[in-house]
């Protein structure tokens, strides 16, 4: 069982996360359903954020002459970067001494109820782990995203659903499983099964015969009508698989001119076979795309009748942004602020 000191460290980390969420108004209004802008939260907390090609370190919290800073490695996927950022932010918020972290913070559970799964670590590390998990994946965010996507607890028995949820949350697959287990969305036994799945295999299953060159760095976003209004913060090499129901029997087709105009290259475009015995059912348009340039702004796709494009079109609106955390240097908004002041 988790000892008292371990439990106290976990609770202290959670309290720190709740306090910062409250102070930054992350737990009210529309913010409750949005992935946490952890890089922005670091800046709002008064620390300088820097990206550097660290190896083997994932990140570090430093403090010199009263000035706080956080350094993150550019050599990790976005989900890992974000968890590391939240972990280092936890060190800052909880008043810890400067510290550097390696991949050990990704392998251990932030909490658990059996001692075999909770390796003993210093109290400050346990606090920062708990802070990071709760800050990036608070109960209200999980609940809001489940409602938006139409996910029920039984859907998370499928590793594919957990992987797609991790992209919406902006966390690693493993961190997402721990948070779902923490909130009793999945049980302990199922959580162990889910952790045995490999995200790289889930990505390849989505892509079928399309060759994925870098399974560690590239994520595959599976987008459907359920993603209406979603904020998509992707890495520059990510792929986007759109599977959209198409009422072709009534003459409706999805148009993707907007996708091209926004800077996407369409890699595959086709329709899935209609299941036997379902003649007249909507077909599923299947499009695989990749962003050729950084994204930033609203993208609206339309399902229309070509001869009457303004006649009751079906819309899918996404808000797309390319993460720049793979570039070395000062966090972009802080760099722009310094340039404006000079």
Regions found by a protein language model. Name each.
Residues 1-288, 295-342:
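Active-site hotspot residues in diverse enzymes, especially metal/ion-binding acidic/histidine motifs
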């Amino acid at each position: 069982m988790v000892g008292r000191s371990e439990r106290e460290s976990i609770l202290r980390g959670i309290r720190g996360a709740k306090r910062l969420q409250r102070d930054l108004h992350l737990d009210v209004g529309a913010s409750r359903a949005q992935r946490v802008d952890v890089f922005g939260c670091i800046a709002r907390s008064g620390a300088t954020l820097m990206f550097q090609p660290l190896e083997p370190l994932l990140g570090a919290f430093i403090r010199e002459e009263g000035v706080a800073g956080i350094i993150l490695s550019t050599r990790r996927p976005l989900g890992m970067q974000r968890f590391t950022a939240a972990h280092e932010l936890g060190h800052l918020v909880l008043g810890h001494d400067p510290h550097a972290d390696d991949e050990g913070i990704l392998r251990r559970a932030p909490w658990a109820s059996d001692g075999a799964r909770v390796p003993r670590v210093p109290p400050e590390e346990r606090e920062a782990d708990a802070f990071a998990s709760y800050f990036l994946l608070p109960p209200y965010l999980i609940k809001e995203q489940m409602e938006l996507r139409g996910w029920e607890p039984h859907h998370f028995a499928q590793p594919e659903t957990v992987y797609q949820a991790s992209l919406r949350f902006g966390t690693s697959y493993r961190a997402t499983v721990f948070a779902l287990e923490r909130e009793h969305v999945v049980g302990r036994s199922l959580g162990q099964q889910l952790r045995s799945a490999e995200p790289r295999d889930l990505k390849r299953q989505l892509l079928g015969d399309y060759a994925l060159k870098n399974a560690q760095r590239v994520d595959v976003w599976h987008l459907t009508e359920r993603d209406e209004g979603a904020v998509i913060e992707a890495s520059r090499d990510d792929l986007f698989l759109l599977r959209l129901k198409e009422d072709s029997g009534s003459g409706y087709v999805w148009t993707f001119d907007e996708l091209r105009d926004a800077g996407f290259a369409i890699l595959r475009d086709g329709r899935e076979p209609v299941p036997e015995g379902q003649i007249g059912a909507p077909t599923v348009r299947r499009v695989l795309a990749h962003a050729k340039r950084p994204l930033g702004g609203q993208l609206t796709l339309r399902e229309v009748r070509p001869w009457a494009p303004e006649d009751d079109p079906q819309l899918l609106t996404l808000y797309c942004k390319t993460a720049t955390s793979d570039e070395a240097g000062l966090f972009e908004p802080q760099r722009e602020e310094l340039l404006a002041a000079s």
